[in-house]
A protein has these predicted regions:
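Small beta-barrel nucleic-acid-binding modules, primarily SNase/OB-fold domains
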Residues: 2-162
Length: 162
């Protein structure tokens, strides 16, 4: 097994083990249908089309009806579209609260190689953390990666001064 695949698999298993005592729900496999924006994706899951909202992250807006296009929004959406291509199969983990007020399914998303996509968005500066209880299984991990991205001034932390 190539070293990169083994490392990704080990990372995924460590993430799952770190949440062994949490209230994470079952994992589902889903097929990407389309990307709406940086943190919202449409998938096919169990022969049903669902809109997903990634837990613990908030990318700058590109399609919000009142906020317009925010700084680094197009880049965040572009990154998500590049990684989450239609047709790929991903693994979804749910936390305690299954849906948001817009009835989007709230998930942590893992790529076919085991990489944690929510984390990738934060560590590469495409998203800020957004901790909304009770869905906080990975909040400390994501906060740590946000701090690192800020310190390294990558992505929105370089381009968008608040």
């Amino acid at each position: 097994m190539p070293l990169k695949v083994l490392a990704s698999l080990l990372s995924f298993l460590l993430l799952l083990a770190s949440c062994a005592n949490s209230d994470l729900q079952r994992a589902d496999l889903a097929t990407i249908v389309k990307v709406v924006d940086g943190d919202t994706v449409v998938v096919k899951i169990q022969n049903k089309i669902e809109t997903l909202r990634l837990i613990g992250v908030d990318t700058p807006e590109t399609v919000h009806p009142t906020k317009g296009v925010e700084c680094f929004g197009p880049q965040a959406s572009g990154f998500t579209k590049t990684v989450l291509k239609p047709g790929i199969t991903v693994k979804l983990l749910r936390d305690i609260e299954p849906r948001d007020r817009y009835q989007r399914l709230l998930v942590y998303l893992f790529l076919p190689d085991g990489k944690f996509f929510n984390q990738m968005l934060v560590e590469q500066g495409f998203a800020r953390t957004l901790n909304i209880a009770p869905n906080s299984a990975f909040s400390e991990l994501l906060a740590s990666h946000e701090s690192s991205a800020r310190n390294r001034r990558v992505g929105l932390w370089l381009s968008c001064e608040r």
